[in-house]
Amino acid sequence: MFVLVMICLFCQYWGVLNELEEEDRGLLCYKCKKYHLGLCYGIMTSCVPNHRQTCAAENFYILTKKGQSMYHYSRLSCMTNCEDINFLSFERRTELICCKHSNYCNLPMGL
């Protein structure tokens, strides 16, 4: 009878215990200074975001004379106080994409 009660108590909290274990493991992000079309020009490593950090992908574009954006390269990292935003200057555009929904979510897709 005691074993049955213990099993019932443990089963009640099974989902909560699993969620805590996943949080303890932490999020993993790619880290690369220059990433272009599936290759890291340098060393591809991982980083674990600290407090108030998320995975980040900074995509750099060159602006053509016609005003169109042409993809140049990306920088992958863990970034503090990251927010999705676009920066535009006369010669280039920088797109900052932040994520924390899954491990290695900062890998650019379709570039």
From Swiss-Prot:
CDD domains found in the cross-reference section: TFP_LU_ECD_PATE2
Disulfide bonds: C29-C55, C32-C40, C47-C78, C82-C99
UPAR/Ly6 domain location: 27-108
Main location: secreted
Signal peptide residue numbers: 1-18
UniProt keyword list: Disulfide bond, Secreted, Signal
GO cellular component: extracellular space
Pfam families (alphabetical): UPAR_LY6
InterPro entries: LY6_UPA_recep-like (IPR016054), PATE2 (IPR029691)
Keyword match Nucleus: no
Tissue specificity: Expressed in prostate, testis, brain and lung.
Subcellular compartments: Secreted
Family classification: Belongs to the PATE family.
Protein name (record): Prostate and testis expressed protein 2
Source organism of this protein record: Mus musculus (Mouse)
